[in-house]
Amino acid sequence: MSYPGYPPPPGGYPPAAPGGGPWGGAAYPPPPSMPPIGLDNVATYAGQFNQDYLSGMAANMSGTFGGANMPNLYPGAPGAGYPPVPPGGFGQPPSAQQPVPPYGMYPPPGGNPPSRMPSYPPYPGAPVPGQPMPPPGQQPPGAYPGQPPVTYPGQPPVPLPGQQQPVPSYPGYPGSGTVTPAVPPTQFGSRGTITDAPGFDPLRDAEVLRKAMKGFGTDEQAIIDCLGSRSNKQRQQILLSFKTAYGKDLIKDLKSELSGNFEKTILALMKTPVLFDIYEIKEAIKGVGTDEACLIEILASRSNEHIRELNRAYKAEFKKTLEEAIRSDTSGHFQRLLISLSQGNRDESTNVDMSLAQRDAQELYAAGENRLGTDESKFNAVLCSRSRAHLVAVFNEYQRMTGRDIEKSICREMSGDLEEGMLAVVKCLKNTPAFFAERLNKAMRGAGTKDRTLIRIMVSRSETDLLDIRSEYKRMYGKSLYHDISGDTSGDYRKILLKICGGND
């Protein structure tokens, strides 16, 4: 069985006239007398090049695909060339043709009304795609000095430097016209006392640690100097290099050589941040009693990404979910607060819709001070889902509206673990460094020291915001954190904590 037109007739497609090629001109392949290809024959080929061959090919393609206006491939042919530049340049549409809408302004399919989402770019003053962002204080690209910057169709005009920038309202909240950008959050990890050590060599550090623990006695100062000045990422490399070089587990060697709170601090430094947190949570809920403050401290202060990693690591390490662990050891509204925080689903935007902030403040007032009893679920929903920037605005609005700080209202309306938990969440959201400064002060105040809290905060915040915590501590208590650690601890334990602290204020 054969199909019409198949196999193709001899000579290729389309059929060629006798003695000619399928596209016109001389037949292909070339006659046997054609010289071999080489650099010395390029000139010969150029002299034999047949323009009629490709011109015929173009005419045939035009007929095949229905193109009536395909330009001739060679400018010298009659009628060849592209049409002249229309008036106004190629950016103007041809006559009797509708202009092409700009990017982001095409109507949706099916005849639906256009979306209310802003067209590209989504914020005023953004650079034209492909152009670099101008330095601060410099005119955006596309504008002459003294003239407004270029904007896309459908965008509001971009203000000149020094003028106030109009901020769009969030859609979906009627009457919202006051959206203010929050102060950009400090970059994670940019205010720690420990950073990557320059010139880091994990094999050399592994050798230092090996010598410090080899033979009779231990050189604790060498361990402090080495591990207390390396970032967590670098410590993980030291672990691997130690095992590679000596075939031994550095953690086991450290456990066998160290003791007490000094050992606990060094081992805390050697864990990754996520692994350290899940073991702190495990310790907080095991046995008789629960360290509720530890649970709230970790879950209220960590980022969404970190909390999600906590959930994955907890399940992998302990064969049960973090939520199951919380449910097994807590109850009531405090349990609901912890479970809400453990989802890692807080809004992380930095813009504030003031009308929504006012509404949330009114609803918190209606759920607490302005009713008999307290609707704890409303506090839970607002405090665990709204962004940090939004909640700061809510707390300020609550103070303005009621004349009372929201922390005092929580103390009046709640009690026990729930009161402590809600207060910790509010304080952490208001001012995270101040929250940790207060926790450190309480850990060292009075008889005895809450060493687990002291170690946990010093280690977990050492690469995040310990410099800010030191500043808040000095402001709140009139003494430096370094001073109080020196007076409340001793020995190598004091030395490693002061090394992490990073200096006296």
From Swiss-Prot:
Sequence ranges of Low complexity compositional bias: 161-177
Modified residues (N6-acetyllysine): 248, 255, 479
Major localisation: cytoplasm
Key words, A-Z: Acetylation, Amyotrophic lateral sclerosis, Annexin, Calcium, Calcium/phospholipid-binding, Cell cycle, Cell division, Cytoplasm, Cytoskeleton, Disease variant, Neurodegeneration, Nucleus, Repeat
Protein name: Annexin A11
Family in the record: Belongs to the annexin family.
GO BP: cytokinetic process; phagocytosis; response to calcium ion
The species this protein was found in: Homo sapiens (Human)
Function, as annotated: Binds specifically to calcyclin in a calcium-dependent manner. Required for midbody formation and completion of the terminal phase of cytokinesis.
Effect caused by changing residue 235 to Q: In ALS23; uncertain significance; increased aggregation in the cytoplasm sequestering the wild-type protein in these aggregates; loss of interaction with S100A6
ATP-binding recorded as keyword: no
Biased segments, Pro residues type: 1-17, 99-160
Subunit structure: Interacts with S100A6. Interacts with PDCD6 in a calcium-dependent manner. Interacts with KIF23 during cytokinesis.
Gene Ontology MF terms: calcium ion binding; calcium-dependent phospholipid binding; calcium-dependent protein binding; MHC class II protein complex binding; phosphatidylethanolamine binding; phosphatidylserine binding; RNA binding; S100 protein binding
Subcellular location: Cytoplasm; Melanosome; Nucleus envelope; Nucleus, Nucleoplasm
Domain comment (free text): A pair of annexin repeats may form one binding site for calcium and phospholipid.
